[in-house]
Amino acid sequence: MRRVALVVLLLFASVCILASCRESPDAYDMMRDFARDYGISGVIYSPDVPEGEDGYTTPELISRIYLTGEVIPSDYAVILNCRADYGAECGVFVCDSEAERAAAIEMCEERLRILSRGDGTSLLIRSGKTVFYSTLTDHERAEDLWRKIVASHT
């Protein structure tokens, strides 16, 4: 009986440890889920896309889009010119350090400034390791959906 209890206790402890050691959220997976649930289509640009396929990108290309030579987070996913929302754009950066997070926030703020021309048609959400920006038309829906996506991936 003691052996059974010990085995059950060890299994329970193992499950608890594994659950607490989850990996960081993946930008590509989060953006894919967001696009699907929001109903937008377009190419997701990410370093997770194999070279030669639609969506393959490099830090050099991202630095040109976001007009930065600063630190660029290594995990990101961006949809440019969403087909279902009048050419809107959205992106997520998953940051491993405060320097990456600060750079991602600055990059997104500058991108939103350029895209929206200060007309209030933009959304920037900083949540833990993730920085998300959007120019999608329905800000409230995008924000609610993004928060659900973040919760399901962390």
Label for each model-derived stretch:
Residues M1-A19:
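Sec-dependent bacterial lipoprotein signal peptides
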Residues A13, C21-T154:
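Soluble, non-membrane globular domain cores that form compact, hydrophobic packing
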